[in-house]
């Protein structure tokens, strides 16, 4: 039930601002568009459809959950860029979601139709022959029914707890005495398969929940089933993780308690596979504490993860043409992995570009450092990790070899908390010193410092990355990783770790840009430098490649730079609260978004023209949470060859007119047509990595 809220003063909304939540929905629509893109291999389009749904689930859990919590506050809370109230935002989100649901359904039906010529069909019961129906009834009786537990809601059996994102069959039952009851049957079960193949028709499948729904009469023989549907709820995940630092408990125990609380938070959305009468919907809403406006009817399966089973079938039937061409990240030509890496890195900086180049080079460096007698310590910040992490294995080995290993494991990495808790235990048991994050700030930086004892004193090798230390996602996300023996960078990295060990943040830095105290101000200063250059009659230039732009202070400074005549180019994959190309405000700002085979995740900052350029790679987007509420690190790229490489990469992305979409002055995204032959930046980067690796290999063999 919504509380009566006090009104707050409205503000003037700048014409160049876009609401964060609506901008994110536009990003997810671009993901959905790839599912409908005939230029993408058919089986891969299934993946985009599943990613779209997974993204939307998390969006509702986190963002809509937060807004719904705000709606319960005593005072109206307004978003600081467009002045929308929490309620106005939720209303707009719901309408946009309903529109996108229609688009998703049309694309899904198109995909299923296009799969049929390749021998793949997903059907429901009414498309089966009588013989097939009997076969599936036998299958249901033997393989599914024994594992189902029906719940008829009554005084003796209250409405059951429904798990987040699990599928349930719901039915309205009429007893012989004329009483109406509600039945709930869990359909998500690891005991039986979800994707059931029809034995008489190769490549034809049915979802287990559809089979359960069809055979409900067998489970309720003494009742008449008046109506039935499949149901799925999405639960709020907006927990306050800062409270773990207020507890007397061990931080890990406190986080585990919060995770348990999250599983039982109120739903923020209910999805139904069929229409139900108003009375039953009202009853379900009451039991689940969901308002009716959060109920969605969908023609698409409630959980799209089954598409990966269809892909497995297509792979097994040698339908490789329906997939992306298999690609293996190449080893960087900058390092000879058959020789010791530390001496090579002491001579030159290395920039790894994932997934085009292999994270193996960095893992090899850690493994070497774990064994090298000159290495005295390894310090590292960890946010998200792969299952069976080789990086953790290297740190464990280093500790077991007597080296000092200090690891900050961020326990508050959303939806990775349990994994990080387990890794923190493993690292501690091996003798590593583990820090569980920082009170008041999430540690999101990607920083590794290897300290060596030499004849001249301590010597540092520093690695700064834009993405997580995760072998799996390094093959799926575009990221950059700088490995340098620059001693000044190493000293500043050491200061970051010294502060973290004291539960503090770095107050000032020189080469590194370190949030939350330094990064935003330094970025603003560099934008101002470009404004000053234009005022002096020189050219001003800013190039930014990030995932999201929401920081109002930075947005307003970029607008000021545009008004002064600074040329600004931005590659912003997701949320962009700045609307470019508006006369008098942002006409000198160009924004594109790239959604392609790999998830764009790298961050690049470029300031100044050639003779006075400054270039950085960073873990931080230009979001308030990154610049003000997190520990982030941006590192300068000082090597001239690597600067040129960054320039080439950025310019290639700005010229991408196959996967790159232009954000227009209307706030919508449009196709681009720049080249006679469409240019795909990710394809070019892989081709270059492959070519360089081949040339280097041949040269070494000669």
Question: How would you describe each model-predicted region?
Answer:
Residues 1-542, 560, 564, 576-702:
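N-terminal localization/anchoring segments of enzymes in phospholipid and broader phosphate metabolism
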Residues 552-559:
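Glycine/threonine-rich ATP-lid/beta-loop region of ATP-binding domains
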Residues 567-571:
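Hydrophobic alpha/beta core scaffold segments
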């Amino acid at each position: 039930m919504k509380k009566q809220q006090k009104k707050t003063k409205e503000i003037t909304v700048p014409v160049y601002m876009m609401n964060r939540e609506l901008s994110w929905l536009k990003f997810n629509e671009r993901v959905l568009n790839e599912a409908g893109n005939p230029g993408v291999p058919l089986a891969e389009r299934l993946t985009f459809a599943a990613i779209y749904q997974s993204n939307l689930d998390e969006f509702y859990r986190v963002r809509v959950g937060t807004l719904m919590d705000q709606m319960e506050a005593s005072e109206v809370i307004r978003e600081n860029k467009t002045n929308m109230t929490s309620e106005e935002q939720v209303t707009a989100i719901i309408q946009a979601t309903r529109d996108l649901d229609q688009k998703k359904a049309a694309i899904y039906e198109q995909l299923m139709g296009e799969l049929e010529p390749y021998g793949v069909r997903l059907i429901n019961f009414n498309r089966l022959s009588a013989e097939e129906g009997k076969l599936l009834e036998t299958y249901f009786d033997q393989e599914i029914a024994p594992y189902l537990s029906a719940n008829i809601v009554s005084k003796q059996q209250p409405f059951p707890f429904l798990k987040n994102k699990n599928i349930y069959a719901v039915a309205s039952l009429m007893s012989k005495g004329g009483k109406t009851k509600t039945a709930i049957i869990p359909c998500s079960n690891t005991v039986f398969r979800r994707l059931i193949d029809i034995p008489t028709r190769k490549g034809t499948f049915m979802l287990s929940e559809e089979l359960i729904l069809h055979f409900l009469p067998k489970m309720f023989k003494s009742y008449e089933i008046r109506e039935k549907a499949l149901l799925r709820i999405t639960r709020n995940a907006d927990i306050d993780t800062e409270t773990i630092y207020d507890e007397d408990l061990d931080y890990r125990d406190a986080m585990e308690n919060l995770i348990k609380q999250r599983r039982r938070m109120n739903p923020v959305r209910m999805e139904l596979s069929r229409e139900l009468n108003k009375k039953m919907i009202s009853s379900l809403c009451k039991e689940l504490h969901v308002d009716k406006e959060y109920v969605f009817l969908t023609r698409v399966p409630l959980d799209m993860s089954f598409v990966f089973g269809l892909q497995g079938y297509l792979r097994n039937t040698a339908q490789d043409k329906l997939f992306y061409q298999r690609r293996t990240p190449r080893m960087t030509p900058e390092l000879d992995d058959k020789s010791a890496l530390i001496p090579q890195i002491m001579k030159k900086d290395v920039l790894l570009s994932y997934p085009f180049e292999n994270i193996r080079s960095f893992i090899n460096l850690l493994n070497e450092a774990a064994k090298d007698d000159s290495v005295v310590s390894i310090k590292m910040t960890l946010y998200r990790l792969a299952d069976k992490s080789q990086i953790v294995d290297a740190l464990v080995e280093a500790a077991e070899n007597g080296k000092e290993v200090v690891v900050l494991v961020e326990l508050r990495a959303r939806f990775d908390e349990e994994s990080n808790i387990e890794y923190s235990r493993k690292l501690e048991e091996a003798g590593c010193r583990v820090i569980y994050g920082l009170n008041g700030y999430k540690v999101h930086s990607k920083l590794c410092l290897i300290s060596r004892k030499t004849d001249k004193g301590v010597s540092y090798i520093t690695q700064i990355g834009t993405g997580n230390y995760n072998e799996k996602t390094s093959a799926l996300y575009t990221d950059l990783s700088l490995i340098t023996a620059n001693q000044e960078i190493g000293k500043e990295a050491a200061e970051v770790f010294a502060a973290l060990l004291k539960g503090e943040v770095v107050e000032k830095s020189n080469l590194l840009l370190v949030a939350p105290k330094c990064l935003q101000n330094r970025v603003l200063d560099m934008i101002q430098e470009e404004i000053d250059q234009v005022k002096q009659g020189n050219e001003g230039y800013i190039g930014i490649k990030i995932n999201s732009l929401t920081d109002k202070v930075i947005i307003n400074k970029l607008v000021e730079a545009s008004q002064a005549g600074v040329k600004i180019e931005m590659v912003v994959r997701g949320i962009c609260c700045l609307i470019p190309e508006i006369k008098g405000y942002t006409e000198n700002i160009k924004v594109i978004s790239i959604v392609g085979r790999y998830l764009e995740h790298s961050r690049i900052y470029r300031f100044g023209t050639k003779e006075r350029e400054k270039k950085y790679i960073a873990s931080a987007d230009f979001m308030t949470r990154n610049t003000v509420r997190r520990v982030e690190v941006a590192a300068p790229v000082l090597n001239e060859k690597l600067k040129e490489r960054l320039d080439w990469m950025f310019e290639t992305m700005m010229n991408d007119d196959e996967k790159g979409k232009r954000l227009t002055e209307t706030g919508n995204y449009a196709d681009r047509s720049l080249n006679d032959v469409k240019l795909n930046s990710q394809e070019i980067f892989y081709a270059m990595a492959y070519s360089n690796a081949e040339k280097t290999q041949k040269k070494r063999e000669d």
